[in-house]
Amino acid sequence: MGKIKIAVLLSGTGRTLDNFVEKIKKGDLKAEIVCVAASRTDCLGLKKAEKYGIPCAGFDIKDHKALSDEINKFVFKFNPDLIVLAGFMKMYYVPENYRFKVVNIHPALIPSFSGKGYYGMRVHKAVSESGVKVSGCTVHFVNERYDEGLIIAQKCVPVYAKDTPDDIAKRVFEAECKLYPQVINLFAENSIEVKNNKVYIKGE
């Protein structure tokens, strides 16, 4: 299995970037992070990318379409195979030539607790208040609507009555740290196929 070239888009602390770097070092993620782009110039994730020696750039642009355009100008210099959203808190407009080459991870089991306004701790607070017994994370393709792209993979975690939103968040992030690299590896293996508006994984 060859390495896949990925561009990482982020807005916050870069926890998922940390996870990717760690997994790559261990040989558990068959990827090369060719660049990092951030929707802010002051976020910790950007500083981490600099520390890791990864080419990076931040953009303070309010308009989502204009932001996507500027990010794409930067990202396309590195010709990534896959664009990976990792805590990217803006709408990203996918270029036509990158259809089914842009993925995101959501901290719940889509279609539950998803869509505009459901991000970060808001998701886990809603899960806690709902009384559901299962939550998890979802890796999906990015399209023109928040969290509505085709689902690629999901991982469940239990939710207990005594859980706080922080408890749920911790458990879900642990699941994310496993699932996201697994899905990226599937792309590296050319094991993902889209047919009839569904995602098929070879061998399943």
Question: Where are each of the predicted segments found?
Answer:
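One-carbon transfer enzymes
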Residues: 1-204
